[in-house]
Amino acid sequence: MNKKRDKGQSHSTRPARAGPPRWLKLDMSPSDIELLVVELAKKGYTPSMIGIILRDQYGVPLVKQVTGKKLVQILEKHGIKLPVPEDLLFLMRKAVNLRRHLEEHPKDFHAKKGLLDLESKIHRLVKYYKRIGRLPPDWKYTPEQAKLIVSAYL
């Protein structure tokens, strides 16, 4: 979905291994990690923040390597689910903030163009999530709906 950048984006490479790394010495079992994930989610942390907390405070490099399940799968198993996928939620938050800015500054044409690009990205992502089944087929992005979802969950 690289529509804007011509070059690559720097990032770290994830290790290609199935199990946990050999150097990992955890005091917790995979079920303890699952309970910790659920507890952090109930405190209001997003899945990406939970991953960062587990990495930085508990020394868990990747939840999937240790538990065998993705973090979002663990949350869904325990009945905790965001209304829309996390990346889409953050894009919607950005669009809501940009619309608020445009209400105060209607002549900001760079922001208008940014909003158009951002909403195009949201529509592409919605189309993808409908195709893979993460969103219902009749789900539609509207600025009003985005405002409600963002205010409820972020």
From Swiss-Prot:
Region (Disordered): 1-23
Keyword Ribonucleoprotein: yes
CDD domains: Ribosomal_S15p_S13e
Any matching Pfam family: Ribosomal_S15
GO biological process, one term: translation
Molecular-function annotations in GO: small ribosomal subunit rRNA binding; structural constituent of ribosome
Entry keywords, A to Z: Ribonucleoprotein, Ribosomal protein
Gene Ontology CC entries for this record: cytosolic small ribosomal subunit
Gene3D superfamilies per record: 4.10.860.130, S15/NS1, RNA-binding
Classification via SMART domains: Ribosomal_S13_N, Ribosomal_S15
Entry keyword Ribonucleoprotein: yes
NCBIfam families per record: PRK08561.1
Summary of subunit composition and partner proteins: Part of the 30S ribosomal subunit.
Assigned protein family: Belongs to the universal ribosomal protein uS15 family.
Protein name, UniProt field: Small ribosomal subunit protein uS15
Species this chain originates from: Staphylothermus marinus (strain ATCC 43588 / DSM 3639 / JCM 9404 / F1)
